[in-house]
Regions:
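Short, acidic/polar
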Residues: 86-94, 123-128
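Active-site region of glycoside hydrolase catalytic domains
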Residues: 1-81, 91-112, 133-136
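Aromatic-rich peripheral "rim/lid" segments of glycoside hydrolase catalytic domains that contact
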Residues: 116-186
Length: 186
């Protein structure tokens, strides 16, 4: 598992760099086994020998709100049980990578639609602000699903419109760092 992924990460970096051209200057992303965001998986990640790498993790947390089906439709920043997974991941990523000068992104995140746009917006504002405070950009997983399955859809490609503008506003507030959540999330 993890040993194989660590080996493949180095093979990937070596292969891209060996092709020449601008590939010697490109930033490349590597991830732990399954892009897992747990501390054991992150601690087991061996960073390939290269100075232009970004660690990418996927983090749908807290699981009960973000991904579990069925799961909770409510999320409140005032409840430590709602924020603890986010706070812990930020601390772990900062300690293992950011504090050592290693770039990190949250390559996938999101909270499924449960007819709870306001709660999702509050979650997104807190989540994005928390990681913005330590220099980690977050990328919403917009899978285009609105009606069934893992409903992370945000932008309706058929109608060319944002389906959840309040959610998008929460993400943008958090990502800008110009929010009350940004100051309390740090």
């Amino acid at each position: 598992g993890r040993t194989v992924v660590n080996h493949l990460n180095q093979v990937f970096v070596d292969a891209v760099r060996a092709t020449g051209g601008n590939n010697q200057y490109r930033f490349l992303m590597v991830c732990p086994y399954a892009a897992n965001s747990t501390e054991p998986a992150l601690a087991a990640l061996e960073i390939p020998d290269d100075d232009r790498l970004i660690v990418s993790v996927h983090a749908y947390i807290p699981y009960g709100f973000a991904l579990q089906n069925p799961g909770s439709d409510k999320w409140l920043a005032s409840k430590p049980g709602c924020t603890s997974d986010i706070d812990t991941l930020a601390e772990v990523l900062d300690r293992l990578f950011i504090s050592k000068g290693q770039a990190v992104i949250i390559g996938e995140c999101g909270a499924m639609n449960r007819d709870n746009e306001e709660y999702r917006a509050q979650w997104a504002e807190y989540y994005f602000a928390k990681f913005k405070a330590i220099g980690i950009p977050c990328f919403w997983w917009d899978n285009g699903a609105f009606l069934s399955g893992e409903t992370f859809g945000l932008f309706d490609r058929q109608l060319s419109q944002v389906r959840y503008p309040v959610l998008l506003e929460g993400m943008m507030k958090g990502a800008s760092g110009e929010t009350a959540a940004g100051s309390s999330a740090a």
